[in-house]
Amino acid sequence: MGGSHLAGTLLQSMDEKIFIHHDYDTPRLPSEILEKSIFVLVSYSGNTEEVLHTFQALQSTSYPVAAITTGGELLKLAQVNEVPHIVLPNTGIQPRAALGYQLRAITHLLKHPTYDILGTLTSQEALSFEAQGANLAEQCLNKTPLICSSGENRGLAYYWKITLNETGKVPAFFNTFPECNHNELSGFNTGTNFNTPGSYHAIYLVDDTDHARIQKRMHISQQVLEEKDVTSSTLKLTGSSKIEKLLTACHIAQWCALHIAEQTQADPEAVPLIETFKRKLND
């Protein structure tokens, strides 16, 4: 849940066999699929309610289970029940900022080929990432960001959305092509009560491996929405591998969100509303 599933969500865009469960209990999938599955429970804090509930539900099954966490109740349960687990470094950072740790852990646990690629990546272009993020943040000033991507890059668009929410402290939304052409465009007709001209900024995550028709849809949608006063930016994914493209774009998202937080003098680390909600949930 939250920042703890982001690594899995990014991997899902490269591996269709990965399924992300965002709920309580075990996934509602056919038994023949469940019986061939490995359940990897990830909670950075180790105290995520939904993850702990699913762990307990899985104990009454014979399905193979593993856990990834920094500690908390999940680590205790894994140790008591002799469940294979990986303990992440507890550096005090937010789960969304621990993407690298979680990617290494999950790919190692699953013996995923991405694990070896991760070890070869460098941060030589980090300064250019910050500049790109700062530029996008400037264009989003006083506007609600709308993140747009292909369906294949849905996980990346979602990463952008939650990073802008949690680090940037702004509302942000995402959608994918071609689906958004069948509904979301209608929300920007002039004269609607919900549309304030000039109050949105769309960021298009463009991958040169996207289907040609998807790329055309993005381009036309960008033109149509600009006529409705929706400003926009295009971020072209770069890298020699899929995972490098994803992580580069994630890096830029972090810088964008950080600069947005600075614009409003918000604390990029703290998540007070989420913490307040959790306290009320436990009352």
Where are these regions (language model features)?
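Short, surface-exposed amphipathic charged segments that create phosphate/polyanion-binding patches used
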Residues: E35-F39, G100-A105, I162, L185-G191, ...
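Active-site phosphate/pyrophosphate-binding segments
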Residues: L109-H201, K280-D283
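A generic structural motif
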Residues: H21-T26, I68, V170-N181, T231-S240
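A short, charged, Gly/Pro-tolerant segment at domain boundaries
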Residues: V271-D283
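C-terminal active-site/capping subdomain that shapes the small-molecule cofactor and substrate pocket
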Residues: N189, P197-P272
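Conserved active-site and cofactor/substrate-binding residues in soluble primary-metabolism enzymes
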Residues: G2, L6, L10, A97, ...
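Short helix-capping/linker segments at secondary-structure and domain boundaries
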Residues: E16-F19, L109-I117, K169, A257-V271
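Glycine-rich phosphate-binding loops that contact phosphosugars or nucleotide phosphates
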Residues: M1-L127, E138, G198, L205-S233
